[in-house]
Amino acid sequence: MKLIVKTFQEITIKSRPVRKRFIRQLAKNIRAVLRDLDPELKVEGEWDNLEVETAVVDARVRREMIERLTCTPGIGHFLEVHEYPLGDFDDILAKCKAHFGDQLAGKMFAVRCKRAGKHAFTSMEVERYVGSGLRRECGAAGIDLKQPEVEVRMEIRLDRLFVIHRQHPGLGGYPLGALEQVLVLMSGGFDSTVAAYQMMRRGMISHFVFFNLGGRAHELGVMEVAHYLWEKYGRSQRVLFVSVPFEEVVGEILTKVDDSYMGVTLKRMMLRAASRVAERLELDALVTGEAISQVSSQTLPNLSVIDRVTDTLVLRPLIVSHKQDIIDTARQIGTAEFARHMPEYCGVISVNPTTQAKPYRVEHEESKFDMAVLERALERATQRTVDRVIDELGQDLSVEEVAEVLPGQIVIDIRHPDAQEDEPLALEGVEVQALPFYAINSRFKELDANRQYLLYCDKGVMSRLHAHHLLNEGHTNVRVYRPA
């Protein structure tokens, strides 16, 4: 299979040195993204095209390659093509007929040809010759250049002919690694996950910082969605996940700060801590999911007061987004279900939160705060690469694993719905229920408490994590299914 990758349009208008740097980075990223699927993958090209060639014939692996490329920043679109040496017009006609002939009977069609290089003919001459030949030989109803039912597309580059089989949309943006790096304040909800996606899509390597307000389930959920975002949109790069224990900070705010300023103070403490993390990691900006006036702390006066606490640039990609648009985007990118089932810990709730915070007033309230508490939180912060968070969480968990299903036991497939659809779990004589990992914690209580449940995932890590959490919640009827 050969793919022709067309770069994001904004890359092509850059100066030659910048364009070459961006395209080299994109080629490097494509190799990194697809390396585990085909170690012999070839990626070559220049200007606005990259040619990706693989000898893999497994249809499932090819589908996975295409899916990964659609989620790789820097790609405008890409084409599945059949490559041939360039022959004469009759040869071009024969190649197009071989691929499109059975689609044209009784259909209106058009022929599109793009060329690069010097040739003794024009693109229009190719289109006319091939179009008339296909109409004559394939029983087509006619030619319609405006709204054809079938498009016969090809590209001619120097002495090569590419007959286009299918076009796939890309993510756009710039290649990860070509721009600066940022730190995303991640809560795992709709806003922060979409904000992270927007930055990654634009081409910025996005690291994550999570402020734990007092819940292991919340931390686990945020780790899972951060891992999902990295795996789907940023796997070409090394990304960090930093977790900062903020329980004592919340307690200090609750006991020392006036009710109306609790929310603003908490946000300022988070920005203080995030700035310190960003400085240590040498990151260029902070990213939050705030939108104007979505909640009381996000009015312009409040945001202005919050930002004064740091000299680090704070980016808010969703600042003028409507909530429904954010939810729709989350659904589109696959984070909506994570957000919908994310445990929430609202430790700082103001009965009458201010929407017009004053700098002098917030400084007065913060003067009561013991900053040693914030320092301790930063000292206790943990850091790991995001590709390892799931594995690390799964270590040393005491959960019973079984290799065989006993009569009456139910296997729960907790894999992502895409994996469930691609490779359904079928066990003869065994009841299998599908309940994705992001919903298992909130929906397990709906199941019959008198039945025994075995959680299943591909590697056994996610199932072990969630079984451990359910056992800690008091559910004694859960085990992990690990077939031999």
From Swiss-Prot:
Subcellular location: Cytoplasm
Residue stretches in coiled coil: none
Disulfide bridge partners, by residue number: 346-457
Active site, UniProt feature: 457 (cysteine persulfide intermediate)
Keywords: ATP-binding, Cytoplasm, Disulfide bond, Nucleotide-binding, Redox-active center, RNA-binding, Thiamine biosynthesis, Transferase, tRNA-binding
Stretches assigned to the Rhodanese domain: 405-483
Pathway field: Cofactor biosynthesis; thiamine diphosphate biosynthesis
Domain THUMP: 63-167
Chain sites annotated for binding ATP: 185-186, 267, 289, 298
Catalytic activity: [ThiI sulfur-carrier protein]-S-sulfanyl-L-cysteine + a uridine in tRNA + 2 reduced [2Fe-2S]-[ferredoxin] + ATP + H(+) = [ThiI sulfur-carrier protein]-L-cysteine + a 4-thiouridine in tRNA + 2 oxidized [2Fe-2S]-[ferredoxin] + AMP + diphosphate; [ThiS sulfur-carrier protein]-C-terminal Gly-Gly-AMP + S-sulfanyl-L-cysteinyl-[cysteine desulfurase] + AH2 = [ThiS sulfur-carrier protein]-C-terminal-Gly-aminoethanethioate + L-cysteinyl-[cysteine desulfurase] + A + AMP + 2 H(+)
InterPro entries: Rhodanese-like_dom, Rhodanese-like_dom_sf, Rossmann-like_a/b/a_fold, ThiI_AANH, ThiI_fer, ThiI_N, THII_Thiazole_biosynth_dom, THUMP_dom
Cellular component terms (Gene Ontology): cytosol
Function in brief: Catalyzes the ATP-dependent transfer of a sulfur to tRNA to produce 4-thiouridine in position 8 of tRNAs, which functions as a near-UV photosensor. Also catalyzes the transfer of sulfur to the sulfur carrier protein ThiS, forming ThiS-thiocarboxylate. This is a step in the synthesis of thiazole, in the thiamine biosynthesis pathway. The sulfur is donated as persulfide by IscS.
Name of the protein this chain belongs to: tRNA sulfurtransferase
